[in-house]
Amino acid sequence: MLTPVFWITQDDDALLIRIRAPHGNIAELDYDHGDYMFVFTCPPYFLRLHFKQMVEEYGSGNGSVEWKSDEGEFHIKVPKMHKKEHFSNLDMITELLTPSTTHHQPHGNQLVEEMDDSEDDDEGDGSEFLVEQQPAAEPEEPKSDGKIEKFGYGFGWSKFGVIERLRDEIGKIVDILEPENVEIEKRADKLMEFDWENFDEGRYLADTLEPEEELLAVISSKFAQKLEISDEDRTKLKDLKKSKTSAKINGNDVEIMTSLIDIVFGYCYDQRVNDWESACESGWNCAKLSPSLSFFAKFSSVKECLLACTRRALTYPLYRSFQLTQRVIQDVCHVITAGGGRPALLHILCDLHRIFIESGEFRYILNDLMIADYIFWIQTVPDEILTRIQTDLTEISGKIDKYDIGWDLEVLEAEAKLANTQLDSDDEPDN
């Protein structure tokens, strides 16, 4: 059975579910709803949705279904049990597809229970509600918790051995060449040393003291980033398979969310310099400018994270302007706060997943290490975590200065200006 693309909106009285099923056999259409679940079948399509709030049972007389032949869509109205109740996170596709362990099927039929493989399952209950919408992920080989705790990387710093195993094939898609030998807690300092060694004073001064018109246009460009969940995102979300993440997560939700900030920074930088669209170098930009993707670093605060992002943006990309980095930080703040929060982040993660697949150079491995797990995580992380990070971002945005970078940028600029003044003076004709 195929999981169709779907959209859900709501008014005070009902959920309005659009289901795209252009090849469905309308004669075999069947749907049901009640309690916390909605089920739709129209071969070859099957859809089962799980809500956090209750809907009325089918047959109440308040629902409806309409076939839109021009669009190949079913429009189904599902009445709410409690009128004017707000249903949250209706764009969190994966979360809607994931069964709840506490709620029930329509009309009180209990959800399928997990059974031991040795038990006889010949006598099934015949319920189409139990059709699996996603195949189980392949189990990973067990890793030493001690090694993961000390040297882990990827989402939640919970993976180990991937880079070492694939190093000959993937080359240098990350700057930390042997993460299995660099402790998690030491990576932030190692990152700063690495970036300082690669910092080009001449390139920085050129973009700072004599910025090109194109750079000035990039800095002044009005925010135009797309933040809505797209049809392409919805297709990815319904088909994306959840891998088994190690039980040894080496970070709490705040630390994991802080890591996501620098991933969003790389994406926002790339969007701004490419006129709000992806380009051939987008995969490189997004991966290179994110300390989490390029160095598997962990940060103790939002400010420390943004300083690391700023250093990398002054060291590696085409434009190396402090003013530009602060503009990008404003973009990040807008995305995570005023720009849509959870849905906006979900869209960005889906787009990054696409970018890393299409950009080549084995960057798809970053999806396996981090992005796919973040796509699932952002749909379920508690609201209070998002609120805390939003508050921290709002407080720090606009308050990072060059002194905080730790590279004596102001001294460097002053010396360059003085040298230019002396050169101009030497060029003046004697009276």
Curated annotation (Swiss-Prot):
Pfam families: SHQ1, SHQ1-like_CS. InterPro entries: HSP20-like_chaperone (IPR008978), Shq1 (IPR039742), SHQ1-like_CS (IPR048696), Shq1_C (IPR007009). One of its GO terms (molecular function) is unfolded protein binding. GO terms for biological process: box H/ACA snoRNP assembly; protein-RNA complex assembly. GO terms for cellular component: cytoplasm; nucleoplasm. Required for the quantitative accumulation of H/ACA ribonucleoproteins (RNPs). Belongs to the SHQ1 family. This is Protein SHQ1 homolog. The lineage of its organism: Eukaryota, Metazoa, Ecdysozoa, Nematoda, Chromadorea.
